[in-house]
Amino acid sequence: MERIFEGVAGKLRISEPELFVDNESRRRSGHMSHAMVEYEPGRIIAFNSNCSPDRLLGHAAHGWIEYRFSDDYGKTWSEINLLQYSWDEFINGVHTISIEKAVCCNGVITLFAVRNSQYVPICCEPWDTPYYLQSYDNGKTWTEPKELSPYKGRVYDAVVKDNVIYAMEVCNDNFICKEPEHVYRLFCSTDNGKTFEERSVVGLNAVDHAYGSLLFRDDGSLVVYGDNIPNGFELDASVSRDNGYTWEQVPTMHLAKGMRNVQVAKLGNGYVMHGRGSHPDVGSGCGFVFYTSKDGLNWDDGYYLEETKKLCYYSNNLLVREPGQPEKLLVQYSDLYQEGTWRVNVKHLWLSFD
């Protein structure tokens, strides 16, 4: 059933969700890793994790990475492909790999690899330094991985603007930032991802924060968002008007239905935010919530697609522009398939503004 949300930025249409990865039938799970990238018009790669259903009841990144191709703007998908690097790391027994974000710049695809520890039950934190790998042949083959940053942490978002790749890392080997040295850093590449250099430390009070998203607004400014973990109804952000060299923290945003694992995108004449919400009867990190905004800083009261499920709805999005069609946002996310566990399938839905 299609849902319609009368948001502040317009009438947001939310399509009926479609099953993308049927982990239930193969008795697997799919924690983290929802990267998507369009490398040519209409030609998309979508990544997902193939994880143990038993370790931490399916909420552990104990597994490897798969990906599929679409040649028709995300309508149909190829058979599963294995990201060999992730399998090699898995069987080596030290790291597992999560692919949270991917970009394409001038025909070169860059994947950002989070290196999780296999030595803890969640197979996630503590993180090692992040790596990246590339494809020069539309995802058929991949280069050997390179280190993105000397800081242990997790790359939460990456975008491309004017032939520059921007990647944002939360530099902390554990989930929640607790120390002054735990900061959000911006790394940039001007050579299609061959090399990256640190551009700045984002001017954001990172203590008690985690997750994050990047957004270039219509006025050219760059916004970094960070989740306030103790208060699931607050979201902090910092704005740069010089492509990430300097920053100004803006007033804290108060979100009626909360936000965790924030994802923000430009769509049509407005902006969309989605992630896990905060429900007064269940707590933070539950449900799947969508907001709209006219400026990327002031958000409406939001819409719950689902209110109470926990430890799922990790998500990502990809803007798709098909000729003769309105702009659409493809959203990939995890959805609980078995009560009493944290085992998830992976689903797709589409967003568009009337």
Predicted feature descriptions by range:
Residues M1-D354:
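Asp-box/BNR beta-propeller blade signature and adjacent active/binding-site loops
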